[in-house]
UniProtKB/Swiss-Prot annotation:
It is a multi-pass membrane protein. This is PTS system sucrose-specific EIIBC component. The keyword Lyase does not apply. GO terms for biological process: phosphoenolpyruvate-dependent sugar phosphotransferase system; trehalose transport.
Length: 479
């Protein structure tokens, strides 16, 4: 290979020397930050000798040459640009400056969730198995598998316990990972997560019913009442609290003498962060969720299929924050007055969103040539179809962005469809394929049609959006 010639041509295809703001390389890739991405001729670069792929990530433009070759190309590029003293960190910093506010936020969420994906995937698959065992009428008319085979009852109960564990104690996993990401001690983060799911607190999933009945337990401290409510399965309160904990910890370490650091810093950090969690962060984020839920209730009842489309479009972003748990209170009220309401409209729309996210992840798994990404995408997609979308969203769809876009568009379309036919659920369950048994009998056909629309739209749209960027699908997981 004529390295000087390749480097010279590559520089031209990148828009010239003036378009390169940072240059470095790793073991296999040339890493750059550019002033204007529109000046890059990606198609011509794909056909350049030695190039094995290219993709954009975190504001950086990366070209894959392979081990050995990249060093030679970089050396020639450095001569042409005069950028021979830069590191990959310099390129990352330059690339970060080009990112909008959404990109680093999405990357940060991905960095936090990716390490805990195996636990969530395991729980999701086990929950799907439990739903199949306990779903009435799914395999046997009028009965579930465990009703037909009582000897399987305890097995189903055991599987349910295994399945719930990662979600009940999600704040522990999440706080550990988030604290590490925010620069704090991850074990202090885990302690904060344990505090948020302590058994002395009202179970977070029981808050909706307790708020309706007015039986929310409180701590009464000098006349000031603090709700004793847990945050099982929550995301946003945990992320905010972990961020506060990390910053408090780092701040304390700067002012507390080293001789007292190991004693006072953990004590004060946990106390301050815990107090703020139960007095400000938790109630505030939960109230936001209730306000949004009330707004969606109004939207559905007044805007018809348009309201259904909007709800379907934004349901997945609610899942990202954990605010979708606030809908349980609304659904409880809707089901309590089922003679008047006809059931809950939230469950079917949630199912459309979940199926869409699962289908998008499966499409990535089909497209991907990278074994690691395929190994994450396919099982995550399956759990999404069964009603558990966190693995698909955080491990695949948000990380690549365009599968998430495809999924929310599919959710909007399918939600509009089922809203036109007033599809509602008469019970709660797994919001996905097993959710068929929860739908009012005369609307099951429309529910199935909606899931088909959701799946096909998300799957096809993901492939269409990803065709021009296959390198991202196959290589971004390793970036």
């Amino acid at each position: 290979m004529n390295y000087p010639a390749v480097a010279k041509e590559l520089l031209t295809l990148l828009g010239g020397k003036s378009n390169i703001t940072a240059l470095a390389h790793c073991a296999t890739r040339l890493r750059l930050a550019v002033a204007d991405e529109q000046k890059i001729d990606e198609q011509a670069i794909d056909n350049l000798e030695g190039v094995k792929g290219q993709f954009k990530v975190a504001g950086q433009y990366q070209i894959i040459f392979g081990s050995g070759i990249v060093n030679q190309v970089y050396a020639e590029m450095a001569k042409l640009t005069g950028m021979s003293e830069m590191s990959t960190n310099d390129v990352a910093s330059a690339g970060a400056e080009k990112q909008n506010i959404v990109q680093p936020a999405v990357k940060g969420l991905s960095d936090i969730f990716v390490p805990i994906i195996p636990a969530i995937v395991a729980g999701g698959l086990l929950m799907g198995i439990y739903n199949l065992l306990t779903a009435q009428g799914l395999f046997i008319d009028g009965k579930s598998l465990i009703e037909a085979n009582p000897g399987l009852t305890d097995l189903a109960n055991m599987i349910n316990t295994f399945a719930n564990a990662p979600f009940v104690y999600l704040p522990i996993l999440l706080a550990f990972s988030a604290s590490k990401k925010f620069g704090g001690n991850p074990y202090l983060g885990a302690a904060l997560g344990m505090l948020m799911v302590h058994p002395d607190l009202l179970n977070g999933w029981g808050f909706g019913g307790a708020s309706v009945s007015g039986n929310i337990p409180v701590w009464n401290i000098l006349g000031f009442e603090i709700q004793k409510v847990g945050y099982q399965g929550s995301v946003l309160p945990v992320l905010v609290s972990a961020f506060i904990l990390a910053k408090v910890e780092l701040g304390l370490r700067k002012v507390i003498p080293s001789v007292l650091d190991n004693l006072l810093t953990p004590l004060l950090a946990i106390f301050i962060a815990g107090l703020l969690t139960f007095t400000v962060v938790g109630p505030f984020t939960r109230d936001i969720g209730f306000l949004l839920g009330d707004g969606l209730n109004w939207l559905y009842n007044t805007a018809g299929f348009v309201g259904g489309a909007v709800f379907g479009l934004i349901y997945a972003p609610f899942v990202i924050t954990g605010m979708h748990h606030s809908f349980i209170a609304i659904e409880t009220q809707l089901l309590a007055d089922i003679a008047t309401t006809g059931g809950t409209f939230i469950f079917p729309i949630a199912a459309m969103s979940n199926v869409s996210q699962g289908a998008a992840a499966l499409a990535v798994g089909v497209m991907s040539k990278d074994k690691k990404m395929k190994g994450i995408a396919i099982p995550s997609g399956v759990t999404g179809l069964l009603g558990i979308t966190e693995p698909a969203m955080f491990g695949v769809n948000l990380k690549l962005r365009y599968p998430f876009i495809a999924a929310v568009c599919a959710a909007a379309l399918s939600s509009a469809f089922i809203t036109m036919f007033n599809v509602k659920a008469q019970a709660l369950g797994a919001a996905g394929l097993p959710g068929i048994i929860s739908i009012t009998p005369d609307k099951i056909g429309y529910y199935i049609a909606g899931m088909v629309i959701a799946f096909l739209t998300a799957f096809v749209l993901t492939i269409v959006l990803g065709i021009g960027d296959r390198a991202k699908v196959g290589k971004k997981a390793a970036a």
